[in-house]
Amino acid sequence: MSEPGMKLEGGCLCGAIRYCINGKVRFVSQCCCRDCQRATGTGHTTIIGVLRSELSVRGVPVTYTSKGESGGDVTRHFCGTCGGRLYTSGTLPGAVVMVQAGSLDDPNRIAPDSVVYYKDALSWDRFDPQLPRFERLPQRSPP
């Protein structure tokens, strides 16, 4: 995870959209849900949970909204020019958004603390055996 009060910056592949996380990172999870697999074309994606109010965005992302496993809306925010994925919002507790860790300028500044939707993990995908694994997104205390 990040240090308290650490500023994290990132953006899309072409640089048209930039963002800054200025607040506490709530979690850093490797998500194995089928939606993330389809959206990324990989076995999982690494997501950083932050409050929406602590994420500032420069540029206007394009969005795509679908229904998540729970039936709530899941909105993916990405660059309309290069297609770079930036963050996901939706019906999450405490106005949390999930930023794509790979879009950080320096992804090595954070580290996963869990694996979520492990029930959907692909047999060939590998995870740190010391990370806790959850069948779904765990209930987290509100910020």
Segment roles from a protein language model:
Residues M1-P143:
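A short Gly-Trp-Pro
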